[in-house]
From Swiss-Prot:
Organismal lineage: Bacteria, Pseudomonadati, Pseudomonadota, Alphaproteobacteria, Hyphomicrobiales
Organism encoding this protein: Allorhizobium ampelinum (strain ATCC BAA-846 / DSM 112012 / S4)
Topology class, membrane: Peripheral membrane protein
Positions bound to FMN: A62, G63, Y64, D65, K66, T86, N140, N171, K216, S244, G267, G296, Y317, S318
Compartment list: Cell membrane
Binding positions (substrate): K66, N111, R112, L113, G114, F115, N171, N176, N245, T246
Keyword rRNA processing: no
Active site location: S174
Name this protein carries in UniProt: Dihydroorotate dehydrogenase (quinone)
Similarity section: Belongs to the dihydroorotate dehydrogenase family. Type 2 subfamily.
Cofactor binding notes: Binds 1 FMN per subunit.
Amino acid sequence: MIDPFKRFARPGLFLFDAETAHGLSIAGLKTSLMPKCHLPDDPRLAQTVAGLHFPNPLGMAAGYDKNAEVPDELLGLGFGFAEVGTLTPKPQGGNPKPRIFRLVRDEAVINRLGFNNQGHEAAFARLSARASRPGVVGINIGANKDAEDRIADYVTGIRRFYPLASYFTANISSPNTPGLRDLQAKDSLGHLLDAVLAARADEAAKAGRRVPVFLKIAPDLTEEGMDDIAEVVLARDLDGLIVSNTTLSRDGLTDTRQAGEAGGLSGKPLFEKSTAVLARMRHRVGSALPIIGVGGVSSAQTALEKIKAGADLVQLYSCMVYEGPGLPAAIVKGLSQALDRDGIASIAQLRDSRVDYWRALKV
């Protein structure tokens, strides 16, 4: 069967540079020309994680809808949830262009965007306008590059968006903001989480509603770094981890033409590394803490492997660049078919079934 995206749309989009093509895809979703996906509800895929109901475990990762322009349109493609951002208090342009590069043979992307976004106020207006609509929409928050107090920027994000967020993600793992990953260090992370969770507690008391907070970490951590993060997280009232952000590694690439570009690598080559780190973090934090697995998800099979490695939920972004807007629905259908095939009553039963394999994998 001919895939119309791969046959017609992708060649046209790939005539443009990656950032322009991304803008065109956002514009396409806004026009409502994209047909909505009408997936039948499969209660075996539904879960309650961190107090939130997810109709299926597949989400759109942060980075696609940076300015909260199309969260509902993304849900309409079949995603069980969508995450917008990363949002910083003040608008910022990010790093100089070009700053996104396709590695077509590897179905990968390198980006050094640098938290380019329109700032809190523009996103707040858009999210306020959709506040009465259903669906889980998370808000990924970060710090301005020139912030004197980066922790204060995260606190500002919690306070500003508290009435509108299904959940928050504190993004401290982008490699494209100088010094940001230093917040993953043990003492710095403790200070950050104490401030963020105190702001959450304050806002929850006012609103009468507790919004979950996740922490997004890098795949390039040492074993000691993973130990430190687990220790800090388990000592606090954090709701979960997102594993992982993009990698600085270029291991295993076949498309070397642009592999030397600075920035974070995402897409299929990230799958093994990010899944191994996911399993190692699951082993460290135990069974109770929710984890969202991200990195190289391109099919129902890779989504299932994330779950078997310890993820409650999974996210994707880069692989949709190559597979098109039909990918989320295809994955969700594939998950249902896998449960049919194996006689599984709930996808949650598969979680952790291959943690030992993945955490032992040399990557």
